[in-house]
Amino acid sequence: MSAKPKILTLGWEFPPLYAGGLGPACYGLTKALGKYVDNTLVLPRHEKKFKVRNVTIIGLNHLVSETSKIQTRKIDSLFSKEINWEEELFSSYPLTLPRKAIRQWSEKETKQQITKSERENLFSEKDIYGSNILKKVSAYTDMVRELADDIDFDIIHAHDWITFSAGVQLKHYTRKPLVVHVHSLETDRVHPQSRNRVYEIEKIGMMHADRVLPVSNFTKRCIMNYYGIREEKISPVYNGYDSDFNVKRAGQKFASSNREKKVLFLGRITAQKGPEYLIETAQKLFAKMDNVKVCIAGTGDLKPHLEYLVRKSNLQDKIVFTGFLDKERVKKLLSETDAYIMPSVSEPFGLSAVEAAQFNIPCVISKQSGAAEVLPNTLQADYWDTDKMANYLFASLNYKSLSDTLTEKTQVNLKDINWDIAAKAVLTNYNFLLN
């Protein structure tokens, strides 16, 4: 064995193809691990021009057209005998699939074979998720299994449920230890009592894993409570953040007490993020002060419903929807923001709150989040306590001494959040398994 552990990393999102928080997290950790391990990363789709130092990246979108080694086979999960197909709601990053989609997949596509041309189409699609996500997961699992014969590795590291099936197959085929990294859970995305196809893949993946790495203690508790995984093999690893975010503030806060203030929500507009609690909080804030607007940045399946609620309440002039924003526009918006709100119902980490803290923005966040653990000097409330959320926002916007104290202390917290710390924590788990 070389001085550096050899890691086979199974990923799904990676720059420049992002759909949610999984991509930035995998990129940050993989990049930081580069100086500690020899890393081979397998992705369903990758742009060859995007490279990471000390990391070998394999994009299946290139392999399907270059090799005849990968054989077609019936789509049949490793766990087919352990999973009951049900007509129910389940999540597909970054949105939820309707019941019709999962029913059609389970009744028809599981009985088909994936041909070479289908593989080429699957991994050439710009949408790396989509309604055919389970078909992509099955094809990814098959191809990773075949590729493993030509890759030298000591440990398998699988990121989130979409790669867990491949990770478990490789573990039993190679007898190499498996690490699964949990960035989000089906019980976060759909409901704590969700027991569907994705939930079963997550549970079986964690049961077969040698180490389970959730992104927070909040997620660790969810894994234990909802999935029944033993505590002794769970080791939380907090995410880092992009420290090269080029933070610039636009103007001075509190320059005028009459200036219109801006409250920001940044993220996917899905049930997991608590958007209806956001609207309720905003209404209570507007009752306390008039010179404030709420900006909702992002998109998601509940965006039309939220827009309807805003129209119904006649708040179109007070609540603004921006839609999807690229990184530069996000930075500009953060530079103009006076307070940040994250009312998530179940948030494994909450990178957007960390990004807001970088901009010296006082943050009001849900207690049901990983960010609450790494940013203890934010104002925190239960997601359903909209009275407290509104009061915290009002105080942050109107009391300069409070705002300054919160942001100064949060800057200290940020020093303990970086990808190198995360990489060293992951390396400790690797060494534990190898020794």
Where are these regions (language model features)?
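Nucleotide-activated donor-binding/catalytic signature segment of Leloir-type glycosyltransferases, i.e.
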Residues: 304-325
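Conserved donor-binding/catalytic core segment of Leloir-type glycosyltransferases
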Residues: 213, 256-282, 295
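A conserved catalytic-core segment of Leloir-type glycosyltransferases
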Residues: 5, 41-148
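Carbohydrate-associated surface elements
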Residues: 218, 240
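Aromatic "clamp/platform" in nucleotide-sugar-dependent glycosyltransferases that forms part
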Residues: 345
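Conserved acidic donor-binding segment of nucleotide-sugar-dependent glycosyltransferases
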Residues: 378-387, 395-400
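Short alpha-helical donor nucleotide-sugar binding micro-motif in glycosyltransferases
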Residues: 324-325, 332-337
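Short hydrophobic beta-strand element within catalytic cores of glycosyltransferases
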Residues: 362-365
